Amino acid sequence: MIVGCREDAKRQWDPQGEPLGQVLNEMTSVDKTYRWEAQDGALNLLPTAGEPLLLQTQVGDFKIDTTSSLEALNQLKTRREIQHAMLNLRLQDGLTIITYSPRATPFSVRFKGGTLRQALNAIAVAHGSDVWDYREIRCGERKEVIIRF
């Protein structure tokens, strides 16, 4: 999601009990600026205007052994490819409020290379049922990116 200086109006909606595909179809029928797709065991909600450039950044293969998606993300963000792309796109790492599960379970992520979005999906799938969120904030001179699990 790419946002500007003002927030969009909030809508009330309670999709509890509905099948996920139906929920995603309802969301994208109400807000035509988004589409959804399934890829490698993950579901992504993407802007119809095009995927943010940072998510399209090519990432080499890696293996991460960890107990937290946040730690896997932190390791991913230190990779040269991501640092270089953020510099070229003039994006700074934004403030993230961290939440964590007190029951840490070890898991491994083996990624054979692809885009940053595919790497984030690989982390989510490896950990089980994680959800990740991507936001670019562009307000005046401020250009930040927030990626969180």
Predicted feature descriptions by range:
Residues 1-149:
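N-terminal targeting/assembly segments of extracytoplasmic apparatus and virion spike/baseplate proteins
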